[in-house]
């Protein structure tokens, strides 16, 4: 299971089309995803304080596009050593097995929602 963070409006736009194509797909050639062990760090670096987020739970076996685990150049000020899952193409929505609310805490930080905490970790 891999996870993708997105804004509610992006999800609402994708649903009628049956696929999700964020700007990163055109700009970088892939859709950024995270494992359960990576998603909170990702959210805290890139989405701190955002109040309109959702977490897509994606079954990678159902993806039509190629999935690659790649080490990013940087994440914020950090140079990670762990590869992140990247979807190299549009996300077919039938690969999304669940959508969870992903609210930030009062201080703007994130923690795993209960529905995600119960998933097997990587």
Predicted segment positions?
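Conserved, structured core segments of small domains
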Residues: 1-122
């Amino acid at each position: 299971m891999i996870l993708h963070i997105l804004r509610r409006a992006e999800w609402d736009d994708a649903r009628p089309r049956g696929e999700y194509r964020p700007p990163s797909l055109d700009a970088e050639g892939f859709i950024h995803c995270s494992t359960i062990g990576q998603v909170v760090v990702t959210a805290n670096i890139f989405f701190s304080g955002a109040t309109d987020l959702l977490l897509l739970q994606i079954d990678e076996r159902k993806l039509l596009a190629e999935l690659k685990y790649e080490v990013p150049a940087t994440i914020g000020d950090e140079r990670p050593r762990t590869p992140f899952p990247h979807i190299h193409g549009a996300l077919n929505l039938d690969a999304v097995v669940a959508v969870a609310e992903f609210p930030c805490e009062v201080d703007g930080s994130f923690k795993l929602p209960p529905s995600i905490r119960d998933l097997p970790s990587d």
